[in-house]
Curated annotation (Swiss-Prot):
Species this protein is from: Dermatophagoides farinae
Top-level lineage group: Eukaryota
Role according to the record: Component of the ubiquinol-cytochrome c oxidoreductase, a multisubunit transmembrane complex that is part of the mitochondrial electron transport chain which drives oxidative phosphorylation.
Membrane topology: Peripheral membrane protein
Protein name (record): Cytochrome b-c1 complex subunit 7
Entry's localization field: Mitochondrion inner membrane
Amino acid sequence: MVHLTKTLRFINNPGFRKFYYGLQGYNKYGLYYDDFYDYTDAAHLEAVRRLPPDLYDQHTYRLVRASQLEITKQFLPKEQWPSYEEDMDKGRFLTPYLDEVMKEKKEKEEWINFLSKD
């Protein structure tokens, strides 16, 4: 148990999080954390559908640019890489919409379960 506590404390360390963020490498393509989502999950698709047009366009632009960079085997210049702090601020653009969709889904399931008890 002590080992697990030390491990969790190490993982939650901001220095380790920044280090791991750099290892993941998606920032080299100019992508944010929420640019990766499960395209087969209905909740994620609904959250993307609810994005405001400007956020959706920015998301699409980042994906197209990253695809082009991957095809040409290049990375963005280091000045254009999103920092860890920027990713924590701007990079979680889909999370509020996804949380909203999940709450609606849970509420709908609870309502159906309530109605089916009778």
